[in-house]
Curated annotation (Swiss-Prot):
Organism, as annotated: Drosophila melanogaster
One of the record's GO molecular function terms: tumor necrosis factor receptor activity
Gene name linked to the record: grnd
Result of altering T51A: Abrogates binding to egr
Protein name: Tumor necrosis factor receptor superfamily member grnd
Broad class of where this protein is predominantly found: membrane
Traits of the deletion mutant: RNAi-mediated knockdown in gut progenitor cells, enterocytes or cells of the enteroblast-enterocyte lineage decreases stress-induced intestinal stem cell proliferation. RNAi-mediated knockdown in insulin producing cells of the brain mitigates body size reduction in animals fed a low-protein diet.
Tissue: Expressed in the adult midgut; under normal conditions expressed at lower levels than the other TNF receptor wgn.
Classification of source organism: Eukaryota, Metazoa, Ecdysozoa, Arthropoda, Hexapoda
Listed result of changing N63A: Loss of glycosylation. Increases ligand affinity for the TNF egr
Result of changing N67A: Partially impairs association with egr
Known role: Acts as a receptor for TNF-cytokine egr. Plays a role in activation of JNK signaling and is required for egr-induced apoptosis, including in wing imaginal discs during development. May also play an egr-independent role in cell proliferation. TNF receptor involved in triggering JNK-dependent proliferation of the enteroblast-enterocyte lineage in response to stress-induced release of egr by intestinal stem cells and enteroblasts. Involved in regulation of insulin production in response to dietary protein shortage keeping systemic growth in check.
Length: 241
């Protein structure tokens, strides 16, 4: 099969070829030529009759050198002339493929991140997931229970009567105020001693106190409290004219 009869296979998207014309190179590699015991490269070399050795095609096909020979290039290096223009195209295709691969990788990463974000939003809003998280938290951090077995950290208390019921320790005694003999004069008394009959709380053995008929008092008699029974009534007070 001749190299010239091979047609290049190509696939393009938007005018950019993705599969280079490699069928020509593959066919040429199968037609290696023997040059007096030496195998020449099927594309880049030819058997030069003058030297009986493999000679590079670039020397006779490059018009910028003094060894340029158009007839010899067309006869012996036809595969080289066909393949050489494709090198730049193949290089562009490789660069394009690398760029496409990079863009696809970035796109897949963005899609994966978006899917993960949507899944987390759905998972947080799911009631089953919230119940599962509450159970895990209750197992990891158990709340201390009260003496009667009720959990005060719970959202509800099942037995409200456990806090306030008849006969419980939480019941408070009612405050009581009793009237005594001095209440008529406007004195409010407590459970023990009327306000009007309270006396200084000094020790009677100190030198600053003097024993009196009431029991004890100050050295200054004007500071001694007069008992209620000895207070003069309104009838005995003389009226000044």
């Amino acid at each position: 099969m001749s190299v010239r009869k091979l047609s290049a296979l190509s696939l393009s998207i938007g005018g950019v070829p993705l599969i280079p014309s490699v069928s020509l190179v593959a066919a040429a590699n199968g037609e290696s030529r023997d040059c007096h015991g030496t195998i020449c490269h099927p594309v880049n070399e030819f058997c030069y009759v003058a030297t009986e050795r493999c000679h590079p095609c670039i020397e006779v096909c490059n018009n910028q050198t003094h060894n340029y020979d158009a007839f010899l290039c067309a006869k012996e290096c036809s595969a080289y002339k066909t393949f050489e223009p494709l090198k730049a195209e193949m290089l562009d295709i490789q660069n394009t493929q690398q760029l496409i691969l990079l863009l696809l990788t970035i796109l897949l990463v963005l899609i994966a991140l978006r899917c993960a974000f949507q899944f987390l939003r759905w998972l947080i809003g799911n009631r089953c997931f919230q119940k599962l998280m509450r159970r895990l938290q209750s197992k990891a951090y158990p709340h201390p229970a009260t003496a009667n077995g009720k959990d005060l950290n719970a959202t509800t208390i099942q037995n409200l009567n456990a806090i306030n019921h008849p006969g419980s320790d939480l019941e408070r005694a009612q405050s009581q105020i009793y009237s005594v003999a001095g209440a008529a004069e406007g004195s409010v008394v407590t459970m023990t001693t009327p306000v009007s009959t309270r006396y200084p709380a000094e020790n009677s053995t100190t030198p600053t106190t003097v024993m009196t008929e009431i029991g004890y008092g100050y050295d200054n008699q004007a500071m001694v409290v007069t008992p209620v029974s000895e207070k003069p009534s309104a009838a005995t007070i003389p009226v000044a004219f």
